[in-house]
Every structure is written in structure tokens, then in C-alpha cells.
């Protein structure tokens, strides 16, 4: 995960979740708002953040700042999908991300769709298993995105050329 600084003008912001939270004190109840925001540049960079304040707009602003601090770069295949299938986990939430053919679209639920829109992915199939909690699903999705690697980065890590590690299905021979 590499930290990235971008201008506010180029970032898209999606408010994923807003909750009213309560703190019980001696004099009664104290209300505040909790917000979860996803930001991205639609070109391979995305981040998510959480903010809490007395007003919704303040909570949203804090969440946006936290999301910008946590922005990460994700390698994309042809700037439309991911390079390989991957699984991410966070607590009881588990997400499976699968690459898709051109024209498939984003097949994903709620908060995952917001992440992929902000990331700039156009074709992906995502399945969530277990917990449907927004925070857990976003965390699991980011865990999966952190596991993604491009063939170029894998080749560099192994001190090989890209064509040595990329195996096409036609090149695999089956012994019958």
C-alpha cells in the first residue's frame, strides 16, 4: 500500500454510511453522528475513512480527511478490472473479488460498489460472505485490494521477466 497525495478537485467522494450514535452521561444522552466515506480518483487510487462529530457535515468532513490520509494505489488490468481473483477477510466478513470480461459491469453490493466506482473499476464480480456490516465489508474489500499484484511487480519480486511468470491456458498441457 503506497500513500498518495492528490488534489481535492480530482477526487470523487461517496458517503457510504451515516449513523446517529448516543453516549449516555449523568445529565442524559449526548448525540453525535458517525460517517463513513470512500474517496477515489477513478484511476486506480482509493481510500476509506471514518469520522464522528456533533453534526453530519462535520462528521463527513472528518471522514473525508481520514479517507484521503489512507489512500492507496491498486494495480488495474487495462484500467477496467483487477489482475487476478482474490479473497479478503475482516472479522466475520469475507469478500471474493473476481476479474471480469469487458462489458460485464460492476456486480457488487452496496459499499463494495462505492469502492469500485471510486477506484475506476468498470468490470468486476464481487461476492460478500458472512457479516454484512458496512465497516467489516469495506475493511475486507480493502484487505483483498491490498493483496492484488500486477504481473510486473511479481516478476520484479522474483527477479524474472513478465513473460516467464505469465502462463496462458493454451500453454498448459494435460496428461491423459
UniProtKB/Swiss-Prot annotation:
Biological-process GO terms, alphabetical: translation
Entry GO terms, CC: small ribosomal subunit
Domain of life: Bacteria
Protein name: Small ribosomal subunit protein uS5
Domain notes: The N-terminal domain interacts with the head of the 30S subunit; the C-terminal domain interacts with the body and contacts protein S4. The interaction surface between S4 and S5 is involved in control of translational fidelity.
Entry's Gene Ontology molecular function annotations: rRNA binding; structural constituent of ribosome
HAMAP family, per the entry: Ribosomal_uS5_B (MF_01307_B)
Record-stated family: Belongs to the universal ribosomal protein uS5 family.
InterPro entries: Ribosomal_Su5_D2-typ_SF (IPR020568), Ribosomal_uS5 (IPR000851), Ribosomal_uS5_bac-type (IPR005712), Ribosomal_uS5_C (IPR005324), Ribosomal_uS5_N (IPR013810), Ribosomal_uS5_N_CS (IPR018192), Ribsml_uS5_D2-typ_fold_subgr (IPR014721)
Biological role: With S4 and S12 plays an important role in translational accuracy. Located at the back of the 30S subunit body where it stabilizes the conformation of the head with respect to the body.
Gene from which this protein is expressed: rpsE
Oligomeric form and interacting partners: Part of the 30S ribosomal subunit. Contacts proteins S4 and S8.
Protein keywords: Ribonucleoprotein, Ribosomal protein, RNA-binding, rRNA-binding
Domain S5 DRBM: 11-74
